[in-house]
Amino acid sequence: MRLCDRDIEAWLDDGRLSITPRPPQERISGATVDVRLGNRFRVFQGHTAAYIDLSGPKQEVAEALERVMSDEIQLGEDEAFFLHPGELALAVTYESVTLPDDLVGWLDGRSSLARLGLMVHVTAHRIDPGWQGCIVLEFFNSGKLPLALRPGMLIGALSFEPLSAPAARPYNRREDAKYKGQQGAVASRIDKD
């Protein structure tokens, strides 16, 4: 069962759930909390590699990822990031989220953006129990026109679901947690699998 708005506010009030900066009451509705777009992005430089062999030797995968991912792009307050049709980019939420060991989060993109062709979170919309950090967004423009994305715009909504018991292996205590504490648009670390 997912938390309703009153429960989300109660979990925020008593510190079991942390969203920084704390969202104002008008951004908590029904069963979700709106999240905004941060100012950090990464893009793929497709011309730098013919392909990535995802099941190849780890070192080769790491080298290919290093070639195809841009350095992090940080936008100023009034700047826009343009996502062109058919392009994939990584971005990050403005908010940092900390989940307790007995709560899982779910991120959904906004329907209004999807209707323009913007996929906000292509896959992996689960936020694990014990998560701490910003949430990396996997943008894809499936529309016909370039889309201007600006830091601070509403980009998605989080919902939360209590677990039957605290997780035995929450994300923040796992040795193999590849994205622990991320604050920027962290590129794929599939080579760490």
UniProtKB/Swiss-Prot annotation:
<comment type="similarity">
    <text>Belongs to the dCTP deaminase family.</text>
</comment>
<feature type="binding site">
    <location>
        <position position="182"/>
    </location>
    <ligand>
        <name>dCTP</name>
    </ligand>
</feature>
<feature type="binding site">
    <location>
        <begin position="136"/>
        <end position="138"/>
    </location>
    <ligand>
        <name>dCTP</name>
    </ligand>
</feature>
<dbReference type="InterPro" id="IPR033704">
    <property type="entry name" value="dUTPase_trimeric"/>
</dbReference>
<feature type="region of interest" description="Disordered">
    <location>
        <begin position="171"/>
        <end position="193"/>
    </location>
</feature>
<dbReference type="InterPro" id="IPR011962">
    <property type="entry name" value="dCTP_deaminase"/>
</dbReference>
<comment type="function">
    <text>Catalyzes the deamination of dCTP to dUTP.</text>
</comment>
<keyword id="KW-0378">Hydrolase</keyword>
<keyword id="KW-0547">Nucleotide-binding</keyword>
<comment type="subunit">
    <text>Homotrimer.</text>
</comment>
<dbReference type="GO" id="GO:0006226">
    <property type="term" value="P:dUMP biosynthetic process"/>
</dbReference>
<dbReference type="GO" id="GO:0008829">
    <property type="term" value="F:dCTP deaminase activity"/>
</dbReference>
<feature type="active site" description="Proton donor/acceptor">
    <location>
        <position position="138"/>
    </location>
</feature>
<comment type="pathway">
    <text>Pyrimidine metabolism; dUMP biosynthesis; dUMP from dCTP (dUTP route): step 1/2.</text>
</comment>
<dbReference type="GO" id="GO:0000166">
    <property type="term" value="F:nucleotide binding"/>
</dbReference>
<feature type="binding site">
    <location>
        <position position="171"/>
    </location>
    <ligand>
        <name>dCTP</name>
    </ligand>
</feature>
<dbReference type="GO" id="GO:0006229">
    <property type="term" value="P:dUTP biosynthetic process"/>
</dbReference>
<protein>
    <recommendedName>
        <fullName>dCTP deaminase</fullName>
        <ecNumber>3.5.4.13</ecNumber>
    </recommendedName>
</protein>
<feature type="binding site">
    <location>
        <position position="178"/>
    </location>
    <ligand>
        <name>dCTP</name>
    </ligand>
</feature>
<dbReference type="Pfam" id="PF22769">
    <property type="entry name" value="DCD"/>
</dbReference>
<feature type="binding site">
    <location>
        <position position="128"/>
    </location>
    <ligand>
        <name>dCTP</name>
    </ligand>
</feature>
<feature type="binding site">
    <location>
        <begin position="110"/>
        <end position="115"/>
    </location>
    <ligand>
        <name>dCTP</name>
    </ligand>
</feature>
<keyword id="KW-0546">Nucleotide metabolism</keyword>
<dbReference type="InterPro" id="IPR036157">
    <property type="entry name" value="dUTPase-like_sf"/>
</dbReference>
<dbReference type="GO" id="GO:0015949">
    <property type="term" value="P:nucleobase-containing small molecule interconversion"/>
</dbReference>
